[in-house]
Amino acid sequence: MQETPSVPSNSSSHSQSVLTIQRQVSALGSSSTGPTSLKTSSTPTPGQLKTKVPNVRRMRRIISEDAEWSLAIVPLLTELCIQHIVKNFQNNPILKQLPLEHQKKVLSNLPPELPLTVTANLIDDENYWHRCCIKRWSVCHVSRHGGSWKRMFFERHLENLLKLFIPGTTDPNVILDLLPLCRNYVRRIHVDQFLPPVRMPTPLQGEEQSDSGSEGEGSEPEKDHYQLQTLVGGLKHLEELDLVYGVKDCGMNFEWNLFLFTYRDCYSLAATIKACHTLKIFKLTRSKVDDDKARILIRSLLDHPALEELDLSHNLIGDRGARAAAKLLSHSRLRVLNLANNQLQAPGAQSLAHALAHNTNLVFLNLRLNCIEDEGGQAIAHALETNKCLSVLHLGGNKLSEPTATLLSQMLTVNTTLVSLNLSCNHIGQDGGKQLLEGISDNKTILEFDLRLSDVSQESEYLIGQVLHANREAARQRTLNPGHFSSPTNNCTENSVV
């Protein structure tokens, strides 16, 4: 009886142990399959890795090592539009239709390499043209161009085209196509080089033709330079024309013909300046202009409505050219005349003096480095006794001596308009210096008097300097207190009128 119940207990325990073993085996199986499946699922392919691994950089709200980082990941729509406008500006220039703040952003991002056909008449922003100038030229003197960067760009761009133009080789449309783009901005043209045509080698001729004695016919090349008439006629605001007919940096290819101002050039230039009614300043220097060519040019300037300054210095002008200039003084509103370093002598200076005695416009006359001598110097001194407008006179290097100094001394006692007088590099001498000292002692208006290398004694130079210092101090006081130095006659006149 006791053994019978023990059997089922053993069998039940056995079955429980078997069940327990099966559960453990199944558990082991499940545990073994579980990590295996997890392991296989945790090793994704490279493509799955890119999509499932989070971007730690985007999750960080502050990135201290990146000073330009911003939490705004997507740019504003306006910024995208501005970027698109800048990128496609050459094909679709949209600027005036934008608000002012957006225009500034577009202009600040535009590249300076855009074609002038797009930007010339559309963009007026000085900052943009400033970037264009700085990118193209290392040295930029914007003050010489009225303080405008846009004007500077177009003036210098046009000048570069003119300097490199080769007649017969360069296409004239290169310059004429620029005219509609720059006509409103160019006020000054300064060209210090005009290239001549390229000299082509003469073809070999047969013996029969060479023996005929005509081998030189037609072999001389053209020497005329670029003609400015069409260009200047299209520049409606042109005020200054500064030209030099020569070649720079010619090196071993130097020839005198490179510096030739031909008659065709002269006639064309004369017609050009005559038709330009806005021209105020005309300069033609270092171009071998002789009397005949000077007369042609000056004839075209008679009764010019706007001309105020004429500079023909460093040329070959003699007395005949000086007489033409004297006639111009009576038939123009010229205020500045520069004939320095020419071939003027006494007759030419006398012609100028005769016109100067009755002139009421000229304030600056430069005759240095000529040879007017005492006859011409005395004539000018006589003219200044009656002239009431000239304020600057330069007679340096003209072989003047004591007789001229005597008359200049008399002139200084009565002249009240001359402010600057230059007699340097002459033979004034000690006696002439003393006479000038006597004359300037009674003069209260002259502020500059140059007597260097004129054989004047140091004592006279010192005393003249003291007089000039007193005149400058008085002029400064008049500038600071203009009402205090008003003349009594003016006050009486004003009181009587009141």
From Swiss-Prot:
CDD domains: LRR_RI (cd00116). This is Dynein regulatory complex subunit 5. Testis-specific (at protein level). Its main location: other. It is found in: Cell projection, Cilium, Flagellum; Cytoplasm, Cytoskeleton, Flagellum axoneme. SMART domains: LRR_RI. One of its GO terms (biological process) is flagellated sperm motility. The gene is Tcte1. The keyword Cytoplasm applies. Belongs to the DRC5 family. Component of the nexin-dynein regulatory complex (N-DRC) a key regulator of ciliary/flagellar motility which maintains the alignment and integrity of the distal axoneme and regulates microtubule sliding in motile axonemes. May play a role in the assembly of N-DRC. Required for sperm motility. InterPro entries: DRC5, Leu-rich_rpt, LRR_dom_sf. LRR repeats lie at residues 276-299, 306-327, 333-353, 361-382, 389-409, 417-438. Residues 27-52, 200-223 are annotated as: Disordered. Component of the nexin-dynein regulatory complex (N-DRC). Interacts with DRC1. Interacts with FBXL13/DRC6, DRC3 and DRC7. Disruption phenotype: Male mice are sterile due to asthenozoospermia (sperm with diminished progressive motility) and the diminished motility is due to aberrant flagellar function, with sperm tails contracting toward one side and generating a circular path for sperm. Keywords: Cell projection, Cilium, Cytoplasm, Cytoskeleton, Flagellum, Leucine-rich repeat, Repeat. GO terms for cellular component: cytoplasm; cytoskeleton; sperm flagellum. The keyword Cytoplasm applies. Residues 28-47 have a biased composition (Low complexity). Pfam families: LRR_6. It comes from Mus musculus.
